[in-house]
Regions:
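Conserved SAM-binding loop
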Residues: 28, 57, 106, 124-127, ...
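Conserved phosphate-coupling serine/threonine residues in phosphotransfer and NTP-handling enzymes
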Residues: 27, 128-130, 212
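Residue-level signature of catalytic and energy-coupling elements of molecular machines
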Residues: 39, 68, 128, 163, ...
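Residue-level detector of anion-binding/catalytic polar loops
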Residues: 49, 123, 207
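Short linear Ser/Thr-Pro motifs
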Residues: 31, 128-130, 194
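Short, flexible loop segments at the rims of nucleotide/cofactor-binding pockets, characterized by
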Residues: 100-105, 129, 203-205
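N-terminal helical cap/lid subdomain that shapes the substrate entry/recognition surface
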Residues: 17-24, 28-111, 115-120
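Asp-based, Mg2+/Mn2+-dependent phosphohydrolase catalytic module
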Residues: 2-9, 15-18, 111, 115-118, ...
Length: 239
């Protein structure tokens, strides 16, 4: 048995791992510093400022919609209306792309794990609070376009993580694409770096591996296991 042959019931039984669902920011790419810079670039002209530590503590894990709402309300402003929110998100997306084009590091070990999965035909998907625009831009730069199916983004769900919808949709998409595998939530491993993401995955019935790429291990207590990054992690170690 591998590291994650753990059922979600009260007792432990072996489960066959059939698919991996990756979060994106902090799991595939070390993008949170870039997101912070983009948010700050848009917020500061409005008189809103916050530290990177506050960003990691209060805003990571939300999609851009809810992040802006929290930034405004926590800093004493009324939440933006829909029209203002749409402009903020568009401006932040452009700022983020400009920053990403200067270079983006991947999380240690993730490219090797993705390459192995693609070589073996092992199903992989993405469930992220980022926008499809952000994700596609980075995947294109990494030459990973087309490697994940499905890709569930903030554009497809009404609520941010910890709501379980994004992971539920990812499993549903995997099951529809690969009916012969009879993929169920408990057959899938989510790889996450935030408490909200772990809660989302567990709420949808997935197993969860936590990475301490953006925070401390004590924030990821719902995960079956917590490790620093994906260096040396292979499909064999996960099965």
């Amino acid at each position: 048995m591998g590291l994650f042959c753990i059922s979600l019931q009260a007792h432990y039984t072996a489960r066959m791992l059939k698919a991996i669902v990756f979060d994106f920011d902090g799991v595939i790419v070390d993008s949170e510093p870039a997101h912070y810079r983009a948010f700050l670039q848009i917020a500061q002209p409005l008189g809103l400022t916050f530290s990177y530590e506050q960003y990691l503590k209060d805003y990571v894990g939300f999609d851009d919609r809810d992040a802006f709402r929290h930034i405004f309300t926590q800093l004493g402003r009324p939440a933006p209306d829909d029209a203002q929110l749409a402009r903020l998100i568009e401006d932040k997306a452009q700022a983020f792309e400009d920053i990403v084009d200067q270079g983006m590091d991947t999380i240690p070990g993730v490219l090797d794990l993705i390459a192995q999965a693609k070589a073996e035909g092992f199903p992989i998907a993405i469930a992220s609070g980022a926008t499809r625009r952000d994700i596609d831009h980075i995947l294109k730069g990494l030459k990973l376009s087309g490697g994940f199916d499905p890709i569930i983004t903030a554009d497809l769900v009404e609520y941010s993580k910890p709501d379980p919808t994004s992971y539920a949709l990812a499993v549903k998409g995997l099951a529809a694409r690969l009916p012969a595998l009879n993929i169920q939530p408990g057959d899938c491993l989510a790889i996450e770096d935030t408490a909200a993401g772990i809660a989302s995955a567990r709420g949808a019935g997935l197993m969860a591996l936590g990475l301490t790429t953006t925070g401390s291990a004590d924030k990821l207590g719902q995960a079956q296991r917590v490790i620093p990054n994906l260096q040396g992690v292979t499909l064999e170690k996960l099965r």
